[in-house]
Amino acid sequence: MLSWARNSAIYRLSKRMHTEKQLRQAITRKAREKFEDIGDRQVEALAAFAVKFGYDNSALDDQAYAEVATRSAQRSGRSKRAISQRLVIKGIDRETASEAVADVNDLRAAVVLARKRAFGPFRRVELDQKRKAKELASFARAGFSSEIGRQVFEMHRDDAELVLSEDVA
């Protein structure tokens, strides 16, 4: 069974990055499916072995996962708040998540979101009250403060392009 746990960990970690929580859940789920008469203690032992194997081979690193996921999410237009929340859901502790999102530029991320959704400076249609409410609500749902949302909403296209052209950390 330990060789199965090792091979399963190798397979999963070679496909994509995982957090400790994700690997533990995947091994637990698959062990219950594969070994019908396995007990809870054995399942936990297999999961712990797989996690230890991942750490021992430097294939499992929550800090690195948090940094990569943060950069990707920022490029996608996600707010600092949304990124942090998503990391915690994935199993990253709050302190590590806070460190990972410390350098996120919410203004830049909001401009990326505006470009993706054709809001604010990238708007292609005439602005009316309904559209204004929709755009501002969208920024709020994405986790941006009302100040950031309003700033991007009122921004000129040239200013938005300038924000986007600035280097990302």
Please report, for each region that a protein language model flagged, where it lies by residue:
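An alpha-helical, amphipathic repeat domain used for nucleic-acid recognition
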Residues: 1-169
